[in-house]
Amino acid sequence: MSRAGGLLAGFAALVLASPAGAGAWTQPRGKTQVILKYEEMRADRGFDPDGLPADLPAERRDTTAGVFAEYGLTDRLTLQFKGDWQSGEDAFVDFEGRGPIEVGVTWQAWRDDQTAVSLYAGYARGGEGRNAGYALPGQGEQDWEVRASAGRSFEAGWGPIPPRTFFEVQAARRMREGLPDEVRLDVTAGTRLGADWMVLAQAFGGQADDGGARWLSVETTVVRDLGDWSVQVGWRQTVAGRETPEASGPVVGLWRRF
């Protein structure tokens, strides 16, 4: 593998640790990656139907412990699985249970030493937890998602872009049963600092159909590579939305490559 190709593979691992799910770069044939993540989001305000901040009746807490796993069926086809266990409470509910379980496949539509484009299709089965951030626990039955991802790395930098930097954009359509359908747009930028450190800046946005909930969250994390292991620590904040909590909290990820 070329130096640029190896850099892209490392970027792929980091992107896949995000709540966006599938990334532009697939796993090589026979390679496996397992990611564990923990999030604890709290909010005492939310965004009303007009998108204006408003106090909640009581603090809302959502705690999630999740797993994401992927396996390279071929160099261009990757099988993926993700699921989580949730607990939370607000003024109206106090719950604990399984979140949605999702299985999908990513196909590498095109790739060279700097750029990758992929298409993803997946199926999710709802659980007792929140199957959407704006939904009541247990609401929603099953989902189908299609997602297109495009990423580009800059090994030597380019203009104001520092060396060993990458950008990725993902656009998705999620067809839901028991909840409104959604469109999603996620953007990631990352840059390497030395051999073992990386800084990531990410934005996760989406909107439910029929004038429903809308959200935009930003996240900044620092990643440390430890051989075949990596540790990611950071903070996520909801900065805009409609009918969604203004949540914030820590994000911790641990993954292992085989």
Where are the regions that the model predicts?
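Outer-membrane beta-barrel biogenesis signature
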Residues: 18-51, 55-57, 148, 158-163
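Residue-level signature of outer-membrane beta-barrel architecture
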Residues: 26-27, 38-40, 71, 107-109, ...
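Transmembrane beta-barrel architecture of outer-membrane proteins
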Residues: 31, 62-64, 98-104, 143-145, ...
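Transmembrane beta-barrel strands of outer-membrane/channel proteins
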Residues: 36-40, 81-85, 119-125, 163-173, ...
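Outer-membrane beta-barrel channels and translocator barrels
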Residues: 41, 74-78, 86, 110-114, ...
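Extracellular loop and loop/strand-boundary signature of outer-membrane beta-barrel proteins
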Residues: 52-55, 88-93, 132-137, 172-175, ...
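Outer-membrane pore/translocation modules
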Residues: 85-183, 187, 225
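Outer-membrane beta-barrel "beta-signal"
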Residues: 102-105, 222-227, 234, 246-258
